[in-house]
Amino acid sequence: MILALNIGNSNITFGGYTTDGKLVFSSRLFADTALSSDELLYKIVNMLALYGAEPQQITAVIFSSVVPALTPRLREALRKMCECQIMEVGPGLKSGVR
């Protein structure tokens, strides 16, 4: 499963996709800038469980953020959650898309 997340000013939206691009689930969390990486991890893992998904099923993660205060905390939470490839959308990302 590929996990895609977007940190916006109000919400963190995310979804799980099969490797052929089919949406498995989508959800959102309030984007609270006071959350620690562990609190973000807890919330994400519990949302995955709500939809019957487990961190071990995640093979890759891609995320974007417009909230600099949350970006490093989310990155750390994702690294704790899975040992998969984590891509951050931003300048210099080599995505293969032109």
Language-model regions, residue ranges each:
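Short hydrophobic/aromatic-rich motifs at helix boundaries and adjacent loops
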Residues: 16-18, 45-48, 87-91
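Residue-level preference for the first positions of well-ordered beta-strands
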Residues: 1-2, 60
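Short, low-complexity, polar/charged sequence segments that are solvent-exposed and flexible
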Residues: 22-24, 45-49, 81-83
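Short beta-strand-loop/turn "lid" adjacent to the catalytic site in phosphate-handling enzymes
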Residues: 51-98
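A short, N-terminal amphipathic alpha-helix
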Residues: 40-55
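Short glycine-rich, Thr/Ser-proximal phosphate-binding strand/loop in the N-terminal lobe
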Residues: 2-44
